[in-house]
Structure formats: C-alpha cells, structure tokens
C-alpha cells in the first residue's frame, strides 16, 4: 500500500494502525481514506475537523473531498502510471480519480487520522496561493469523465477548488411529471413554471391527489418526477441536470434543492438518514454550508 502525505503534515498516533485494521477486515480494500482536520504552523492548535461521507463519486467529481489521508494499493498506482506532470497542483486529485476507477473496494475510516498543516503559502490557509491548481483540478475531472465514458461539461464554481459537472443527456429523453395536490390553480402554476424552466425535455403531465393514485399504465416515459403542486421551478435546465445523474445505472433517485422564497432560506436539500427533518433546512440560500455541502 501507498499513503499520500505532505511533508509538513502530521499523522495521528494510531493512523497506520487504523489503516492496517481496515485492510485486515476487508480483503477488497483497494482504497482507504480517513477524516482530517487542520493544524497551525506551530502545532499549537487543531481546527476545522472534516468529517467526511462514505464514498460518493458525484461529490468527488465536485471537489477532492477525500484529500487526506489517502491510502491505495501499490499495484493500482503502478497500473495507472503514478502521478502525471500535466496535472501539477492537482496531481493528488488526478491520482485519486484514476485510482477510484480501478478500485474494487473503497473504504472510509470515520476518524480524524490526518492533520493538515496551515501556513500562508499552503492552499489550506490561502486558496489563492496556487491558482494553477484549480485549472489542473478541472482538467483532472474532465479526463476522468472521458476515461469512464460519461460525457459532461465541468465548470469552476465561485469558491476555489469546487466544480460542477453537467452530464450530457440523450436528446429524446422523456419525463412523466406527476403533480401531487388538490388545488387546480397550483397545478396550473406549477406546470407553467416547469414548461418555462425544464429545458428541451419531453414531458407528460399527470395530476393526482396522492402518490398512491399513480398507476403504472399511466406512465409513458422512462423517468418519473413527483412534485408537490405548490412548488414553483426557478432555475433553468434543472430537469436535464436531474436526468443527467439519474441516467446512470447506480443511481435510482435524484432530488433538488428547494428554497423558501419568502425568507430566502433552504427548505429542503435532501433527507438525513436516521434523523428527522431535511438537510440544511433554515440555512440562508447563499450559505455554502459545512465544507460547501450546501453549494454542492
């Protein structure tokens, strides 16, 4: 196995023990990563703990959330040819993406095992210190998408090191839209907002009082969208964005962010497993959230 570390960063005392335990417990552990935090130049203070999700490929295509500690089987690194000079500044991001493509098992250790050193010339403290790294990161994602055969456009977001992928969608894709609600006026207004913002997607519209009323024989298209009739769509091409992710065989359900227009807060940004309520509910619309999760 090979572990990636910056020369001035620190490992937790039990970091290698935890990695070896993961390897021993999981024979298919090709890639392993852990949580991390930051540490001041004088090692006096640790801060900004990053408690990461288990492996999430769409999140990884938006930001190198894996980062540190990253451990990979040596045979995989040899197979892909190691680092590539063309991606200097984001060579670890490029390597991680290529390793992920080959890995059979990807495991997350939910413990802080890595302390990222912060100083003025590091991206941990000053994202503007290595601007070339962000273009390299964008190119790394583009190369990854080509490698896995998933055409899409990558654009940089406002904050450095964060990206958005828009996947190519088949031109003749259709969606059956099921409006849920009793108010006919709401249904008409919701339908109007969808037609105005959905983009070039064929749509079939069905109105029902509850989801239970939808019958399989009514559904004409490959994808089904359930929408509360009180909702109004405002972003352009949101439907194609949803289909872009839903079209892949590993994905079955896709949601979008809902906002409260009256007070400009997030109403719904996904469900929280094991907890009541919705992710980031009540946060300001412009908030980026915990490690930019609101934004991504």
Which role fits each region the language model picked out?
Residues 14-46, 231-275:
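Conserved donor NDP-sugar-binding/catalytic core segment of glycosyltransferases
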Residues 1-129, 143:
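Nucleotide-sugar donor-binding/catalytic module of glycosyltransferases
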Residues 207-220:
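Active-site-proximal specificity loops/subdomain of glycosyltransferases
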Residues 94, 174-178:
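Cell-envelope/extracellular polymer assembly enzymes that use nucleotide-activated donors
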Residues 44-65, 272-296:
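Short, flexible, basic/aromatic active-site loop/helix in glycosyltransferases
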Residues 126-152:
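Catalytic core of nucleotide-sugar-dependent glycosyltransferases
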Residues 189-202:
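Short, acidic, metal-binding catalytic loop of nucleotide-sugar glycosyltransferases
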């Amino acid at each position: 196995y090979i572990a990636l570390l910056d020369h001035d960063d620190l490992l937790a005392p039990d970091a290698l023990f935890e990695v070896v335990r993961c390897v021993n417990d999981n024979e298919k552990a090709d890639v392993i990563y852990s949580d991390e935090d930051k540490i001041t130049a004088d090692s006096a203070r640790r801060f900004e703990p990053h408690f990461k999700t288990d492996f999430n490929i769409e999140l990884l295509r938006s930001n190198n959330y894996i980062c540190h500690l990253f451990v990979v089987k040596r045979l995989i690194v040899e197979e892909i040819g190691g680092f590539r000079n063309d991606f200097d500044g984001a060579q670890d991001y490029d390597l991680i993406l290529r390793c992920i493509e080959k890995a059979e098992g990807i495991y997350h250790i939910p413990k802080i095992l890595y302390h990222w050193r912060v100083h003025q010339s590091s991206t941990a403290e000053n994202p503007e210190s290595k601007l070339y790294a962000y273009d390299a990161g964008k190119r790394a994602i583009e190369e990854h998408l080509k490698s896995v055969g998933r055409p899409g456009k990558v654009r940089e977001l406002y904050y450095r090191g964060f990206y958005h992928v828009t996947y190519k969608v088949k031109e003749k894709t259709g969606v059956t839209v099921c409006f849920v609600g009793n108010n006919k006026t709401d249904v008409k207004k919701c339908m109007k907002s969808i037609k105005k913002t959905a983009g070039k997607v064929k749509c079939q519209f069905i109105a029902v009082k509850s989801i239970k009323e939808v019958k399989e024989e009514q559904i004409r298209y490959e994808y089904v969208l359930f929408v509360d009739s009180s909702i109004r769509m405002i972003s352009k091409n949101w439907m194609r964005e949803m289909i872009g992710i839903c079209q892949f065989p590993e994905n079955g359900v896709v949601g979008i962010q809902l906002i409260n227009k009256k007070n400009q807060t997030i109403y719904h940004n996904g469900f929280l497993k094991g907890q009541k309520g919705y992710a980031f509910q009540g946060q300001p619309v412009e908030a980026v959230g915990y490690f930019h999760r609101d934004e991504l």
